[in-house]
Amino acid sequence: MRFKGLDLNLLVALNALLSEHSVTSAAKSINLSQPAMSAAVQRLRIYFNDDLFTINGRERVFTARAESLAPAVRDILSRIQSTIIKGDLFEADRSERVFRIISSDYSTSIFIRGVISAASTSLPLLRFELISPDDNCHDLLNKSEVDALIMPEIFMSSAHPFVPLFEEKMVCVGCARNHEDRNISSIQEYLSMRHVVAKFGRGMRPSLEEWFMAENGMRRRIDIVVQSFSMIPPVIQGTERIAIMPYRLVEHFSKFMPLKVFALPFPLPRFTECLQWPSIATPDLGNRWLRAYLADHASQMMILDSAEYSGASI
């Protein structure tokens, strides 16, 4: 099938090549033989009058023309997928769709696990794939390779829509056995204590609390750096170290280990956990259902938490 001289099947081949960065892998991803894929690449080069890529050692380097085509091709194919192939109906109780969600250890522990538990009872055919956020999570969003991303608002991409799910506060926590009778009475005392901090991804991105400390000129003695908030409670057990982490996650871990929340002589920041999705998935009925389902569960969680959320003792 041709449209103004372009064989539309070649768009599928081009998208696979741009996604896989390998002729062999691209061929496998769309069930073509390697000779057929190589022939498609040659036809694409002729149509666009461009090499599309060159080989530099073992690395495949795309041309500027190929790079410029990538988002448009992804957008076209994703729109076909969401508006034509999937049809006009989405029945959650009958669907076997797999929803791919980027979710941190924090959001999985205090929010997504409840969502999945509820779905497993009433919507047993639905499946979920949870992906840990890393430095390329926005690339997955740009390529529409995930259905949703759940992270704090400060990490939201400006290229896609998002909505707030719930608000969270940060608290200072330590081992209850080692800090049974201790309070923190001054900023100087807090800064002089030994700290554990969380940084994220290969780039070791600082957490919200680190930005807060830097903006307020607070320099702490950092003994240990971990890559998730969930690593903090085990690390501080049996020590005098303290850390700052989300309150709901402290509540979660306090069921398994002794934790103490300290009142600090200065306010800690709050953050808003948000839901983001690929912009081209906005009209997709399945994605619309997922967004509503997540928002409804977030609302229910806030209602259940409201009575005890204002306190900071565990």
UniProtKB/Swiss-Prot annotation:
Sequence similarity: Belongs to the LysR transcriptional regulatory family.
Keyword Repressor: yes
Protein's name according to its UniProt entry: Nodulation protein D
Record feature DNA-binding region, as residue ranges: 23-42
Keyword match Transcription regulation: yes
Family annotation (Pfam families): HTH_1 (PF00126), LysR_substrate (PF03466)
Residue intervals passing through the bilayer: none
Keywords: Activator, DNA-binding, Nodulation, Repressor, Transcription, Transcription regulation
UniProt cross-references to InterPro entries, sorted A to Z: LysR-type_TF, LysR_subst-bd, NodD_PBP2, Tscrpt_reg_HTH_LysR, WH-like_DNA-bd_sf, WH_DNA-bd_sf
HTH lysR-type domain segment(s): 6-63
Domain of life: Bacteria
CDD domains: PBP2_NodD
Function according to Swiss-Prot or TrEMBL: NodD regulates the expression of the nodABCFE genes which encode other nodulation proteins. NodD is also a negative regulator of its own expression. Binds flavonoids as inducers.
Molecular function per GO: DNA binding; DNA-binding transcription factor activity
